[in-house]
Amino acid sequence: MIIDRIHSDFPNAKIGILGIQLPCPNGGITSCYGASGYYHDWYGETVTALNYNKFLEEKCKLDKYKDYCKYFDTKAQFDVEYNYWTKDMKVNNRSEVVERIGINGIHPSLDGYNQIGDSFYRALVEMLKH
């Protein structure tokens, strides 16, 4: 595992492990590619992300890693409604009313990546204080 290798080469290093954000609830999960399987829908992707984050958090708490690994919970700080790519679309052919629809529910927008960076930076600063 890469964590073991880093710790072996740099035994005094602290390692921050960043979780992943939840998918966009406004759609867009499969708009950019042809996904199939349990992860191609919003619910399936959300459950997968939650399980993956739980795995990372529990890994960091193991006796083997707890002294030098810290899990950073991005999902708690990421705005899933407004930090993915979206476009405004008419709600139907007879109405001029528009709604925001996700066009990529997996990869954040530039603002979303900046928000992830901000959360990582805050967690990293806090980790280095201790």
Model-derived features with residue positions:
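Hydrophobic, aromatic-enriched interface-forming segments
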Residues: I2, I20-C24
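A short helix->loop->beta-strand "cap" motif at the edges of active sites that frequently abuts
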Residues: F10-K14
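Substrate-gating cap/lid alpha-helix
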Residues: P25-K75, L110-D111
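Histidine-centered active-site loop/cap adjacent to the catalytic His
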Residues: N93-H130
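Solvent-exposed, polar/charged alpha-helical surfaces in well-ordered, non-transmembrane soluble domains
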Residues: M1-D4, S8, L50, K54, ...
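Mobile gating loops/cap/lid regions near enzyme active sites that modulate substrate access
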Residues: L22, G34-G37, C69, T74-N104
